[in-house]
Amino acid sequence: KPNNSLTYSKKNNINLKLHFFEPSEKKSKSTLLLFHGGAWAFGSSYSLFKICRDVSNQGITCISADYRIALKHNTKVKDSMDDARAAYQWIISNAKVLNIDPENIIVGGGSSGGQLAASLAMIPDENNKIIEKIKGLVLLNPALNTSVLDREIPDNIEERRKNLWLLVKKLFDGNFEQFSPSNYIREGLPPSIIFHGKSDKTIPIEIIEKFSNDMIEKGNMV
């Protein structure tokens, strides 16, 4: 269980919380903020509780974030991205009270949560503002190239994956290019570590390899 759960946003009677796992002895100034996976449609912040506890046992504060998801809140990808940004900004605004160093926040996530994390560091908001303070990215089988979701769905994939692909396509509202971190690679991005399986059928390893190579070409550390 987390040491503390605090509401960072209330939308349409939905309480979105940040779940804090505090180390008994803080050995690092860093804080790790994580977003769960689930195709922007399902999943739960609870799924990261064990990872967060393991991280906190190493002396680092770890936070698992709620955000709105399609099958529970009837939302789209843009809403999930807005929540991720709101969660980060809330931590920054309350850093002093939370005893968090705002200059040492690492952001991470798995699958769709990896897209949310990378988006925070890479994609500008509606006012063309970019978050430049993020210390690093920790990405687990991340959805870094969402442009590929706009392809025609192959006939030979299993029904369950086909249905999920159709659902995700609807959630993007056509913004496959705009919401794809791979389209925002530039110099000066945070150092990143990416964990990805070579046999991943949902996100082929080639996508991750291209992203990594493109990042390195721009002088970023991956």
Regions found by a protein language model. Give the residues of each.
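Alpha/beta-hydrolase superfamily serine-hydrolase fold, recognizing
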Residues: 1-222
